[in-house]
Amino acid sequence: EVTLLIAAYNEQEVVAEKMANCRALDYPAGKLRVTWITDGSTDRTVELLAAYPEVTVLHDPRRGGKTAALNRALGIVRTPLVVFTDANTMLNPEAVAQVVRCFEDPAVGCVAGEKRVAGTGNTGAAATEGVYWKYESKLKELDHRLYSAVGAAGELFAVRRELWQTLREDTLLDDFVCSMLIAAQGYRIAYCKEAYALESPSADMGE
């Protein structure tokens, strides 16, 4: 069994799209547990999620930040593998299956998926962001071929739950730190380009 963990703060605008995306994932029925952690949310995110009986919602009205929410969720989740994704990013249908396949290698403790930027044009912030993530993905792929990728992006990555280490609540790059803590335990970070998360581009260079 696998948990798909979605950390969300006031994401009511994307709940329907994200849940349609979750339901489109090509993974055996009953083997994927979709869990949202919505700590601190004050909009209709929790209310809207109530319409999806297959979803587990973890909610605390107190807002402690994303890192605190992830720490709390990992204290509750019990599946051997946990796949992390953001509420505003959409996964390709094969993403979870491809990520899970990487864990067939017992030396792999973390899997980094690929981040793609949707609808990037030839100019402006969208184009620049798209080029950056293509470059970042290529570096991860090359590192993986040599031995182990370095770091993972929060839009799509996965870990063996038993290797998770509680993060300091002032951690800024939780995805990177989490993956590197697993690498420090002697495990490899695999890169899986067949699993990708699609995200809308930033509106401007400031974002």
Where are these regions (language model features)?
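Short, acidic, metal-binding catalytic loop of nucleotide-sugar glycosyltransferases
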Residues: 20-31
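A conserved acidic beta->alpha catalytic loop
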Residues: 21, 37-46, 62-64, 89
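Acidic donor-binding/catalytic loop of UDP-sugar-dependent glycosyltransferases
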Residues: 44, 87-102
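Short aromatic/hydrophobic "clamp" motif used to bind/position activated sugar donors
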Residues: 82
